[in-house]
């Protein structure tokens, strides 16, 4: 599965 659980820079 593809998921994104990282602190992305805003």
From Swiss-Prot:
This protein's record includes keyword Secreted: yes
Keyword field: Amidation, Secreted
Residue list for modification Valine amide: 10
Compartments where located: Secreted
A cellular component annotation (GO) from this entry: extracellular region
Known tissue expression: Expressed by the skin glands.
Protein name: Novel peptide 3
Organism: Pithecopus azureus (Orange-legged monkey tree frog)
Record lineage: Eukaryota, Metazoa, Chordata, Craniata, Vertebrata
